[in-house]
Design a protein with these regions (language model features):
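Short, structured active-site "lid" loops
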Residues: 39-60
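General beta-strand structural signal in soluble alpha/beta enzymes
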Residues: 27-32, 51-54, 78-79
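Short, acidic/small-residue loops that bind anionic groups at enzyme active sites
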Residues: 71-92
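Short glycine/serine/threonine-rich phosphate/pyrophosphate-binding segments
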Residues: 12-15, 58-62
Length: 96
């Protein structure tokens, strides 16, 4: 399964790297040349799971333009920066 992690802060990026050790995937952080809109468009089309580390509202607004169908969309999960909570947003039920 191809996974991609996106963090919004340094703290979130550190957590994304720890998560990627257990569930391998690419890790990115918004900022500089890496925009939220660009990252989401790229990874929504190519990966089977997107894991955002940060606020649910940011993730929802980022994925909204790309959502097509339950069968076609990747799984999308948001993890809080503290690593305490994970909120599944899309399609996880169809992967298993």
């Amino acid at each position: 399964m191809s996974r991609a992690y996106l963090a919004f802060t340094a703290k979130g990026e550190a957590l994304a790297h720890r998560l990627a050790e257990a569930l391998p995937g690419s890790v990115s952080r918004c900022g500089g040349d890496r925009t939220l809109k660009g990252w989401t468009a790229e990874h929504f089309a190519q990966d089977e799971a997107l894991i955002f580390v940060g606020a649910v509202g940011i993730a929802v607004r980022a994925i909204a333009p790309h959502c097509r169908s339950k069968a076609a969309d990747p799984a999308v999960v948001v993890v809080d920066e503290g690593g305490n909570f994970a909120v599944p947003l899309l399609s996880g039920c169809l992967l298993y």
